[in-house]
């Protein structure tokens, strides 16, 4: 029976640096699953709608950048190997979302947010601190974060033009995946955050969405 490879602290730091580069450098990440948008027809949208959808997808892309950083930070400081492995697996699944959003943004003739490095650093730090506190808090933070993401995705789905089937297919699959991540984190023993904490997280999320919609 094969044994799981043990990484030294230096190995883990190098892996984190590699993950950060693949997350932040344009077109450097690769998805495991094809984009749900591939099978959808490409309908013409007005310039106003195109810019609006690009802004929404830019928000979602930055959200995935934050998710990558959060999971990687938690994986670095998680105490139990099974929790660390779960964080690393979740980060791999989020790569698909990252790539899909980036591809759609480029199809719409726009760009990803210049603020991504800032939000990556902040999210990585939050994830690392949560992991240091306890694995239960770390998992609970995942569940609470995914709840926020699901809320944003639902709002964005309502705002999409009816003819934009490509963006809709991407966001619907992302919503399904994120709901599963939240449920899995709680089932693994995650702490259910109280309403005031979730409210504070929501305020921070609004800062991200407002700032990345245009830049």
Swiss-Prot record:
Pfam families referenced in this protein's UniProt entry, alphabetically: COQ7
Top-level taxon of the source organism: Bacteria
Membrane topology: Peripheral membrane protein
Entry note: cofactor: Binds 2 iron ions per subunit.
Pathway: Cofactor biosynthesis; ubiquinone biosynthesis
Keyword Membrane: yes
Region (Disordered): 25-44
NCBIfam families: DMQ_monoox_COQ7
Function: Catalyzes the hydroxylation of 2-nonaprenyl-3-methyl-6-methoxy-1,4-benzoquinol during ubiquinone biosynthesis.
Protein name as it appears in the record: 3-demethoxyubiquinol 3-hydroxylase
Species of origin: Pseudomonas syringae pv. tomato (strain ATCC BAA-871 / DC3000)
Upper classification of the organism: Bacteria, Pseudomonadati, Pseudomonadota, Gammaproteobacteria, Pseudomonadales
């Amino acid at each position: 029976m094969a044994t799981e490879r043990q990484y030294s602290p230096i190995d883990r730091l190098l892996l984190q640096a590699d993950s950060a580069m693949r997350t932040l450098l344009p077109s450097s990440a690769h998805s495991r699953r094809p984009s749900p948008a591939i099978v959808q027809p490409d309908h013409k949208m007005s310039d106003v709608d195109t810019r609006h959808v690009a802004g929404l997808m830019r928000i979602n892309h930055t959200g995935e950048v934050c998710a990558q950083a959060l999971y990687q930070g938690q994986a670095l400081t998680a105490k139990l190997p099974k929790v660390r492995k779960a964080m690393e697996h979740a980060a791999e699944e989020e790569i698909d979302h990252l790539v899909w959003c980036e591809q759609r943004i480029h199809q719409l003739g726009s760009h990803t947010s210049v603020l991504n490095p800032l939000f990556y650093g902040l999210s990585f730090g939050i994830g690392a601190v949560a992991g240091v506190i306890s694995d239960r808090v770390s998992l609970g933070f995942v569940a609470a974060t995914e709840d926020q993401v699901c809320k944003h995705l639902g709002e964005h789905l309502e705002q999409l033009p009816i003819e934009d089937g490509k963006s809709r297919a991407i966001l619907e699959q992302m919503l399904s995946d994120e709901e599963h991540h939240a449920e899995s984190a709680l089932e693994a023993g995650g702490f259910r955050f109280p309403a005031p904490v979730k409210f504070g997280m929501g305020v921070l999320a609004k800062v991200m969405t407002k700032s990345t919609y245009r830049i």
